[in-house]
Amino acid sequence: MPDPCCNDKCECKEGECKTGCKCKSCRCPPCDKCSSECKCTSKEECSKTCSKPCSCCP
């Protein structure tokens, strides 16, 4: 049986898997924009550089 959170993908929370979700295919989309607090020029860079991308974004 798959984890309850794993339907098509895990439920996401602040750029990471929702607490308690265990899913190999969990890929939470990064935020559209990083704020100035995150020194990133693109959302891809933000998702790699920032520990919690969505918390870094407005």
Swiss-Prot record:
Amino acids binding a divalent metal cation 4: 31, 34, 50, 54
Positions contributing to a divalent metal cation 5 binding: 34, 38, 56-57
Molecular function, one GO term: metal ion binding
Keyword ATP-binding: no
Residues the entry annotates as binding a divalent metal cation 1: 5-6, 17, 21
Binding site for a divalent metal cation 6: 40, 46, 50, 57
Stretches for region Beta: 1-29
Binding site for a divalent metal cation 2: 6, 10, 23, 26
Chain positions recorded as a divalent metal cation 3 binding sites: 12, 17, 26, 28
SUPFAM superfamilies: Metallothionein
Region (Alpha): 30-58
The UniProt record lists the keyword Metal-binding: yes
Entry's family note: Belongs to the metallothionein superfamily. Type 3 family.
Function: Binds six divalent metal ions. Known to bind copper and cadmium.
Protein name (database record): Metallothionein-2B
